[in-house]
UniProtKB/Swiss-Prot annotation:
GO MF assignments: cytidine deaminase activity; identical protein binding; metal ion binding; RNA binding
Name of the protein in its database record: C->U-editing enzyme APOBEC-2
Signal peptide per UniProt: none
Cofactor(s) annotated in UniProt: Zn(2+)
The keyword Hydrolase appears for this protein: yes
One protein family per Pfam: APOBEC2
Function description: Probable C to U editing enzyme whose physiological substrate is not yet known. Does not display detectable apoB mRNA editing. Has a low intrinsic cytidine deaminase activity. May play a role in the epigenetic regulation of gene expression through the process of active DNA demethylation.
Name of the gene this protein is made from: APOBEC2
UniProt cofactor note: Binds 1 Zn(2+) ion per subunit.
Enzyme Commission code(s) on record: 3.5.4.36
Keyword vocabulary terms for this entry: Hydrolase, Metal-binding, mRNA processing, Zinc
PANTHER family linked: C-U-EDITING ENZYME APOBEC-2, MRNA EDITING ENZYME
């Protein structure tokens, strides 16, 4: 029974990361997956390619994608026109703090009133209601912040609570967009680890344009 439970835990961990599920009979591989910390915020400059290919894919039904991946670009401009820029990514477990909240807690916990902030997020899925509320509160008290959020998928978009939250984001001045194929390519080139000898070129999946149009229509209906 214990071995079955361990295998189930490992399967869940692997599926969330888009990892290969074929080698879970290997005791060492199983031990490695089980020992991964289950709930944490991970930050870095580039995310693994297999995570991107699985987590950012703009599928209609996102089964197994129980994390949020957030890639960010922060540009802080002073009165002299000089721009300080930074970029990176965060990932979360949905049972812990979400990536959107973690961004304001760890990446940009304070705002210099002498600077103007232009922040762009590329997120695997749109914010939940609680994260939308946190974003709205931050925007309301930080007049020198402009936030653009590009999302691969819409999270639980049929739920009235989520629709209301997305509308409130728009009303608060947050720009919300669906990621186009060109945006996925930008993330691939700027935020994804490239293995030695691997082609830098982005390889779009078969239904990337179709799914973009699907989500773009849904978002337009929600925000109108």
């Amino acid at each position: 029974m214990a071995q079955k439970e361990e295998a189930a835990v490992a399967t869940e961990a692997a599926s969330q990361n888009g990892e290969d599920l074929e080698n879970l009979d290997d005791p060492e591989k199983l031990k490695e997956l089980i020992e991964l910390p289950p709930f944490e915020i991970v930050t870095g400059e580039r995310l693994p390619a297999n995570f991107f290919k699985f987590q950012f894919r703009n599928v209609e039904y996102s089964s197994g994608r129980n994390k949020t991946f957030l890639c960010y670009v922060v540009e802080a401009q002073g009165k002299g026109g000089q721009v300080q820029a930074s970029r990176g990514y965060l990932e979360d477990e949905h049972a812990a703090a979400h990536a959107e909240e973690a961004f304001f807690n760890t990446i940009l916990p304070a705002f210099d009133p002498a600077l103007r902030y232009n922040v762009t997020w590329y997120v695997s899925s749109s914010p939940c209601a609680a994260c939308a509320d946190r974003i709205i509160k931050t925007l309301s008290k930080t007049k020198n912040l402009r936030l653009l959020i590009l999302v691969g998928r819409l999270f639980m978009w049929e739920e009235p609570e989520i629709q209301a939250a997305l509308k409130k984001l728009k009303e608060a001045g947050c720009k919300l967009r669906i990621m186009k194929p060109q945006d996925f390519e930008y993330v691939w080139q700027n935020f994804v680890e490239q293995e030695e000898g691997e082609s830098k070129a982005f390889q779009p999946w078969e239904d990337i344009q179709e799914n973009f149009l699907y989500y773009e229509e849904k978002l337009a209906d929600i925000l109108k």
